[in-house]
């Protein structure tokens, strides 16, 4: 079973677990969230081990503004990422979203089993730049790019959705800007307001400080 199918099963299991623990009552009160769904928020990221692992590995990774191109092959990807981020750091926020989305979407889609011999592996941006990856890896690379550009944590979410057309799990990045929720999606060439997307049902979302579970 690939990640795209496993992601929905994980969310269902998580919902049952949270309900059994009463977390829905302890977490932030549910309100209307992404794609019109009701959302519940919590802050125990240890329940999202793959994402927590990415954050841990990121703390051990050189920041993109290290322009060295020596050592392992990934270092040159770091230098290229550095140059790209520096080229857009003074642009307005919408222009940054467009540039980051375009830059990362140029990489080919590659399943985890091809890259890593595993059905589910969450890459750091440096791993993505070196090997490319699947939908969640595009979203993570975009998330971290914007964080390095100075975007606050609370303006970004990595969102796992159910694609109602393909009947598969999918992952996107959502940015909150000027009262809008903008999707950065490797399956959609241009930025798009989530209000204009009707074939995604949100399942869960994470950033560095919180998780959200959605109910339609």
Predicted segments, located by residue:
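Bacterial N-terminal signal peptides that target proteins for export
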Residues: 1-12
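A structural boundary/capping signal
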Residues: 2, 22-216
